[in-house]
Amino acid sequence: MCRPLQLLFLMVLPLAGIAQEAQISDAKYIDDALSAAPAAIAKDAAVVRIGNDGAMRTLRKGTNGFTCLIMGTDKMCNDKNSMAFVHALMNHEPPPNKVGISYMLAGDKGASNSDPYATGKTADNHWIVTGPHLMVFGPPSKTLGYTKAKDPDPNKPYMMWAGTPYEHAMIPVGPAR
C-alpha cells in the first residue's frame, strides 16, 4: 500500500461527495485514471483505487514509476517524487527537495491559488480552474520565472500557491474549461 495516496484520497473524498468504490467498474476506472497521462506514460503506469473505507487496491501494476488515480473527479498520474510532495502537503510537512512531475491531462475542477488547504471557492481564495496541464514540483520549479499572480491566466504557465512551501509550476497544455 502507498500511504501518501491514501492520505491524499482521504482528504479529498469528503469534499467530492463521491463513493468511488460504487461509482464505476474497475475497468472504466482504469481507463479514466489513465486518461490523465500521455499514452507513452499511461501504457506502463500503475493504477490504484481507494475504497470507501480508505483501503487502497492496486488495479494494475506499473513498470515506469508513475501511478494514476482519480481523486473526486480529477484524474492524475504522478511520479514517485510528486507523490512525496503530495504526502508532505497532506501531512503539513516540508516538501521534499526533489523534482516531481504530475500529469492532469483531463484538467481539474479548480483549486484555491492562495490556500493549499481550501476545500471550495470563496470570495477571496483566488479559485482557479486549469485545463489539461502538468505540474512540476520541487525547488527547481521556482526558477522557471512563471507569474506568481494570485489570479493568473490559466492558459499560460503560472506558479500555484506562490509564497508557500508548496509552490509549484502549473504548465497548461490545452485550453482552460
State where each predicted segment sits:
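Sec-dependent signal peptide recognition
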Residues: 2-10
